């Protein structure tokens, strides 16, 4: 669900609505886009609108609008774990039950809204990329703003092609229906834009924060490139791109060291720590600032003294059992089957719940949280190095073992990992699973590292009642988009048949 009552103060009203509904809404407001982009402040406001869409989204009918909540508000990180083997829903919603049971179709509303979130964010990025370069302003700041837009455009398109395959490519701001692109563009063409955007971002992003947290750094672009390269390499069996992934990941690790304690990653008092290469700032949304993270509402079970803990999602028993119960220190941080109150009383749960985002000392009453969404962090860079080197060498060399052990040793795991190709690959996949619960990784990792047949077997083992299919390595194209395109956008194989 994308609805929940929050206290919200929305700033930059024109810029926010000017980026509104990418596919079928006309820009709103008294100032036309042609007459607006004249000053440095206009450029900054246009760029800030991107961050609004990442968090707030576009909800013209208020907080109960089905569109409420942006790209990273909740469904992004929920879908990637639920359309896999990590989580289940406790909602009565058919939409979420169908995701859990692998019976998803082209009418699924969470998928449709996420698609729209991606493209609405791209719309805002394209406005900046098209309009800001012609503004007479400080060149360094101008380049920085355009680089931010290119960073996020690359991120949105990368997730789109990972989830849906070929998708419409809109490289420029669409100001009329006649200019719109209503057919699917090949992933290969979109990859070229992603590579280009991120290389520009590496050069033109700056480390000095303009306002608030959550701005991408040059290393953020390098880290995202590492993620893109390892995915491209897996799709194309390209040792060259595996090596590029290794090189980019190494370049980031030097500047963003991992924390010593896994639990410290998620403390509200430790937001934007050295391990978070880029994160979504739910506290100061880089416009007027507001709280709105849904982690506690969706993931915490009902607890005495904790407000609005709904427990809409829980972890699977398969995920719980996959941890080293005695030694993996991430387990107690990430999942709980019971909770001990301050008076010593214990509440047991009938299933494991995700607790990692709750800083009970800083936010004892829960509800909407200031916890950051750690979209890209250093532990992933170590695992990318391990994964890529294993593919390059068809087995783990010493450097690959050192990389995976950087993550394992922090978790308290000291046993040796297998170094044969398949054994090490499974070890890396397990580390991704345990390290990034509810961080938007699992489905992406499974579809990158496993064959469709392996994907089906893994899901079926974790969820025996589910009906996974090999075509579930893609999500369905929302029927709304097919209808709006008058069927020039085609459906992915297996869906709607």
Q: Which residues does each PLM region occupy?
A:
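Positively charged n-region of N-terminal signal peptides that target proteins for export
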Residues: 1-4
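Elongated scaffold/linker segments in the mid-to-C-terminal portions of large proteins
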Residues: 38-42, 47, 51, 55-61, ...
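Hydrophobic, small-residue-rich alpha-helical packing segments that form membrane-like cores
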Residues: 173-175, 179-234, 240-244, 250-260
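Short coil/turn linking the two alpha-helices of tandem helical-hairpin repeats
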Residues: 161-162, 168, 209, 231-237, ...
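C-terminal motif of bacterial Sec signal peptides marking the signal peptidase cleavage site
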Residues: 17-18
